[in-house]
């Protein structure tokens, strides 16, 4: 009787395990569209306890954003002055206030922003100033969808934090277009094959591959010797820039954390020495 109950329990457990396995497989989805694609994992400079952003890579990445990504994607949460903050791509120690940085002023002035005329109340257009936020590419979401085949281009200012996989995902997504499509994989007209995208289909066409060998980095700051603008290099640089955009206070946070740990360490040593000194006196035998 006990053996029969044990057999039932064993069979029930095996059935439950198989059921859970089926659920896990279903949740994982069909990955045949990946066609052997293996994610690449660059050595990002901002990872680790003491990691920080690569200034030159961010400057090149900003150029890639402006000349490639800016045609569709916004930077809704980024102001021009943020580019000149400490830890930012164009930080200059001589201009603690980024609003005074001439490079930031020049960058902002390249954009046209809407404003309100203080006398008439009319909507006017003027050159941007460091305090302005990056203006939207499209006036509204409907216009953005109309210009992109019904798809809404996501805001890129926090995209690295908003996507699972973070910087690695963005980097691989930009490279994934070059991977060969399986022969039996169907693509709806207006979509493109990318094994990194869930389902293998994406509305955004290849952005960097057509520029391989045709894109040229500019020297925004003196002393730079930019590398060749290969697809991999452009993907790395623009991802570095977007990683900073999504977490601009990363370096300041790590610095504050390090100083806090140092303070706690010194405090612990002082408390231990005080403890030893106090208890040394208390442990001495009482004379008399």
Kindly give the residue locations of the regions a language model identified.
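Gly/Gly-Pro-rich "capping" loops immediately C-terminal to redox-active cysteine motifs
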Residues: 77-166, 188-219
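The canonical Cys-X-X-Cys-His
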Residues: 65-76, 238
